[in-house]
């Protein structure tokens, strides 16, 4: 995983250009419902996906009553809402590979929205499997840099069964195999508390540097529009903004 120290830059994560809080909550609730419905148990101790969903909800301060309502909804046999997990893959301008993960109750609607977004911002939606070979599918756990030294966190990660850690000026980013994700997350949560973020995602094997402000803004606009869709859970790309472009964009109102 070397070369991904600017992880926040690469993925264009939560910040000023992210979706509104209400939309974040909608996505969290949907993930809780689908995890409870499709998992082997409604007990998070026996359902890793549900446990991960509940951890993500706590990280984002989703109110407990809304979590309980989501769990009750999943257990309600009269609830006919059925969500399908879909992964869309395509290219933005300049050959940037994009992966979009979605949960939808209407595949045609979601596909049309995603395709329209790609087209509007100069990209093209491809077939599933067209770009995923450019990424590593793995678990990601992030803690603030001041939680402990890189050496201490690395020791904990090795003990827990994780396979890599990248530390930059603000964040320790831990990577795990998917099958070990829940175990590593549980171990680190017991040692360091709830992380800033944790999820299973697509991390680029190599990144394309964007050093042009206009190209960067168009790419980030595509990511922003995709993330605003209620059906879209996460967006990943194999890009990285150059330091100069990143600072310019961060400095804009």
UniProtKB/Swiss-Prot annotation:
Keyword Ribonucleoprotein: no
Keywords attached to this entry: Cytoplasm, DNA-binding, Transcription, Transcription regulation
Cellular component aspect of the GO annotation: cytoplasm
SUPFAM superfamilies: YebC-like (SSF75625)
DNA-binding is among the record's keywords: yes
Localization per record: Cytoplasm
GO molecular function annotations of the record: DNA binding
Primary location class: cytoplasm
GO biological process: regulation of DNA-templated transcription
Alphabetized Pfam families for the sequence: TACO1_YebC_N, Transcrip_reg
HAMAP family hit by this protein: Transcrip_reg_TACO1
Sequence similarity: Belongs to the TACO1 family.
Protein name, as recorded: Probable transcriptional regulatory protein RPR_05505
